[in-house]
Amino acid sequence: MPLVEGPLYRFCYGEYKNMVFDCNGTICKSGAHEQGRHMKFVKELKRTHYCGSLGVSQAGQKVVLMGWVDVRRDHGSLVFIDLRDREGIVQVVLDPNKAETASSKNLRGEFVLAVEGVVRARPDGMKNAKIKTGEVEVEAIRCEILNESAVPPFQVSDTNVNEMLRLKYRYLDLRSARLSSHLITRHKVAQLVRRFLSDNGFLEVETPILYKSTPEGARDYLVPSRVNPGHFYALPQSPQTLKQLLMISGYDRYFQIARCFRDEDLRADRQPEFSQIDMEMSYIDQEDIMEMNEKLLRTIWKEIKGIDVGAIPRMTYQEAMDRYGIDKPDTRFGVEIKDLKSIVTGSGFKVFDDVLARGGIVRGIAAPKGGSYSRGQLDKLTDMAKRAGAKGLVWIKSEADGTLSSSVSKFFSPEKLAEMFKACGGEAGDCALVVADDYDTACAALSTLRLHLGRELNLIDNSKYKFLWVVDFPLLEYSPDEKRWVARHHPFTSPKDEFAQDLVNNNEAAYGKMLAKAYDLVCNGYEMGGGSIRIYRNEIQQAMFRLLGMSEEETQHKFGFFLEALKYGTPPHGGIAWGMDRLVMLLCETDAIREVIAFPKTAKATDLMSDCPSEVNRDQLAEVGVRLSTLAEKHLEDLKKS
């Protein structure tokens, strides 16, 4: 009985689920028979090449390919198939009138196909420069449909599919050339890192996933213990104390690609679980770690991107904040922040005078060609500054002939406006944007505006990678909400030597001036890695915990094991952690971490594919001694009603 399209063929739509067909069109009563025959084919003929690996050097060779049907084109006497696997696509030519390739009549998108054939060079005029295998095609000798596919919810090659749909069917999206390339790059980076660090004397050591709750700023993911009722593990936010314990243990060069977990609000470049390239070294100083990591960076960029990275410049935290308003500046473009204090002091403009009297700042930037901004565009920029925390935004526009207009024209003379405009870096045809507020708020607002202008005005060269070390971070920062000093990085970061005694002596007057032996590696406005020299003396670590407001009881409960370890000959040590996901994101030139993770979460920390997190039954909760709160019960009830 010939196999033809029609009612019988629609098994792939679920109408004849118990019927399948062999290549000769025979109806088989069970899928088990088909599976056995398919596996016999796979056992007899092993794949010899990936689809995307073929080129003219293989012309004339017999090959066996296995993959998915990307596109099928029926030309009557011949059927053309674009066969896809993780390495790419190749065109396969089949004759549907031959028994060995008769099944080509029945192929549809995403069917799994095995092909034995001969590689042929395409004739001139028939080559496809859009794909890397475009100079060749495979002339099929025989083929086998290894499995059928339901009609997919979207074409794998379609780049305009709603992201939520792609995440729900992530296994289909992962077949795309885009995501295949990203995951292959990720693998290459992991292999490079392991090879480089191993060659430089590092040992890869795995640390526990079930560990003690030692909060590092974000909330912990907690895991109840069944065998120890009322007790909890925490999924580690980082292996911080563990890698320091390895230094105490004598493993003086450690690394791992560590899984980390943080229960925090998400952004485009954040996930609740993530990977970091974690390393620690003993008997070193800050320069040693920075030098080692520059070498690693150069190795990665040379081998993955073919780019030679030169010397990486350095900038202090204070300079980064003053010039760019942020501690991870994108230095691919200018539009730097300028200080207007000397110009506007005593100007009589109450807004500026009041801010300066409170110890605030008045600073501005110049938007290139912003002199043509409409009132609506300026209102949009003002709203943007307000969302960043600023009270408002002053603008000064210049026409092409240099004529100025401003939102504060009635408060300043034309000469003073011109002076302010020029101080912001403005030229004819530009627009100066000025913020007056406390230091942190003004920096945040101007940084937000600067990055917006960089993107909107196409000031950023996306083909460039601009690296930067940011150093000399504050050790501490004051939290108005908590009314106490908190660690800028984490409580294990060492102060610079000149501040160590102030820390031990609880010299509160020096807290705001203390600098840390900390360093961040920045690329294109992203913090790619961050680290520090660690506190390695017990009395300094205890002083840090006291400064942070931790009682002796709390310190012992959370970190008693670590303080005890510091008593037993701890060497000077330090380290760094790179965000693996962010690193690959930059290398793949995408702006979303979800694009470089196989199975990512959404911005609400959910997995649409597996529908998790999900409700568990009450027996499971009872086993681990957990009972849902009234709020959680109400949430579940509301979900069931919706």
From Swiss-Prot:
Its main location: cytoplasm. L-aspartate binds at residues 216, 262, 489, 534. It catalyses: tRNA(Asx) + L-aspartate + ATP = L-aspartyl-tRNA(Asx) + AMP + diphosphate. Keywords: Aminoacyl-tRNA synthetase, ATP-binding, Cytoplasm, Ligase, Nucleotide-binding, Protein biosynthesis. The record marks 75, 125 as: Important for tRNA non-discrimination. One of its GO terms (molecular function) is aspartate-tRNA ligase activity. It holds the Pfam family tRNA-synt_2. It comes from the Bacteria. InterPro entries: Aa-tRNA-synt_II, aa-tRNA-synth_II, aa-tRNA-synth_II/BPL/LPL, Asp-tRNA-ligase_1, Asp-tRNA-ligase_1_N, Asp/Asn-tRNA-synth_IIb, AspRS_core, GAD-like_sf. Residues 240-243 are annotated as: Aspartate. GO terms for cellular component: cytoplasm. PROSITE patterns: AA_TRNA_LIGASE_II. It is found in: Cytoplasm. NCBIfam families: aspS_bact, PRK00476.1. Aspartyl-tRNA synthetase with relaxed tRNA specificity since it is able to aspartylate not only its cognate tRNA(Asp) but also tRNA(Asn). Reaction proceeds in two steps: L-aspartate is first activated by ATP to form Asp-AMP and then transferred to the acceptor end of tRNA(Asp/Asn). Homodimer. This is Aspartate--tRNA(Asp/Asn) ligase.
